[in-house]
């Protein structure tokens, strides 16, 4: 990795904020010349072929997820950085854990690919991500790096953080070019993307990374949260779970949602999440997951 980039990251002044859950926002993350090369190369995004997912439901709309076959040269740099020990160290220090694992440590990123692009009309409703990887590592942190070459505040598209049940937006973060957002993930870390109203030729481009720990680090992490932020965050076992009828707050409800077939898929997952979080808890939901996995 470029020594200039390494030194810049090592000398970052990290200031954590704690509401609605721990996060930090870092502007001018990469040196300006590196960022310009990345954003300039992304102007060829319409030629990308390695499309993995294309979302078109009312809670996941106008969002495309790409693999890394198109991410050569400068475009691979953010993936390498976000998956590196440099960023892991920031999270490990905050959480008091060791041996953190990122998506970049797995073949095909564990199926959660690192480059996302959204365009006008796009929205990503309030949700919590999957709680565990396929091999049962606990998902504890996320990184989002904004790489559009320009973004006007009037275009929306903010990353938003919601209250701990996902029904009210508490904070919005503008996807400012060359801005990095790090946040601690838990079963109450509802987040999403506000509706985008950018010009049709302007895309909201981001790099994304998840971070995981072994269960053996769990108790130590919880104890550290109590000391550092005065409370422990909530963890249980669940898949990625959206707020099915109120994607960007209570006022976003539309009667047409009730007539959409996929709404009921989201409702089922949300009910499973609520039971796991508020009735079963971490240990028992984990026991049930292992029990049913063995049976299948």
Task: Identify the role of each PLM range.
Residues 82-138:
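Non-heme Fe(II) oxygenase catalytic core, chiefly the N-lobe of the double-stranded beta-helix
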Residues 25, 114, 142, 206:
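Amphipathic alpha-helical recognition patches that constitute DNA-binding helices
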Residues 23, 127, 191:
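Histidine-centered active-site/metal-ligand motif
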Residues 121, 131-139, 148-294:
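Catalytic core of Fe(II)/2-oxoglutarate
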Residues 57-64, 97-100, 132-133, 216:
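A structural signal for the main folded, soluble domain(s) of proteins
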Residues 3-4, 13-95, 233:
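Non-heme Fe(II)/2-oxoglutarate
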Residues 46-48, 98-101, 148-153:
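Proline-centered turn/helix-capping motifs that create local helix->coil transitions or kinks
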